[in-house]
Amino acid sequence: MAETHHQVTGPEEAPKPTPLFEAAVLISLALAVLALFLFAWLGNEVLQGDTQHFDLTVRSWIHGFASPGMTRAMTAISLLGYNILIAELLIAFAFFAWLRWRRAAVWLAVAMAGALALDMTLKYAYHRTRPTAYFGAAPHSYSFPSGHALCSFCFYGVLAGLLSARTKSLAWRLVIWIVAAVLVIAIGLSRIYLGVHYPSDVIAGYLAAAVWVGTVIVLDHVRKVRSSRRIAG
């Protein structure tokens, strides 16, 4: 327990904002705006059918790595992106409760509720039919954007943002973000490998999630700054 508190802050407490951290928040906001424009552009390309060559080429290339062992691994990785998110959320909430990070738990809940709503809304807006799955039957929902890519990005991205903002060690902040990035990328690749999404679906999921994650991180930072000012005043 003592070791944990050397790495993370106490209940509802965050490290004092530094120029580096302030810059990171501004970068998050800028990336969210950029992701919004890129998603709009990609969505239009999909509706026009202009991503077909790219999608088929990448799908074929990734499928070239198929093997029984790889399929088992990718199936397991894919579960982390959607199917067992409820269990992962409960673990995260329990961790936040242990550290008495009530507001962090609220932000994570808001982020995931928004992610699910965003996924359903965008799928029905674009009505893209799924590709033929390589292993088993494809899900019955629409294909664009990838819900696994969107939800995993939101969950691990917001979780990394909340943890790193409340972690004192710069080294641990880097570790948190690296682990989150590896998980998100692996989950996206697993959906392409299994054949249940086009590559453009996965990219779109990442872009949509980046908009939402950037928004949540900025709002969390604004809340902490206002709280600090009230305490100081």
PLM ranges: what are they?
Residues 39, 43, 70, 118, ...:
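Alpha-helical membrane-inserting segments
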Residues 53-56, 88-89, 95-170, 174-178:
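Membrane-interface loops
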Residues 83, 87-92, 229:
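Membrane-helix interface/capping segments
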Residues 40-41, 120-130, 186-197:
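C-terminal ends of transmembrane alpha-helices
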Residues 21-25, 29, 104-108, 173-180, ...:
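Residue-level signature of transmembrane alpha-helical entry/exit and packing/kink sites
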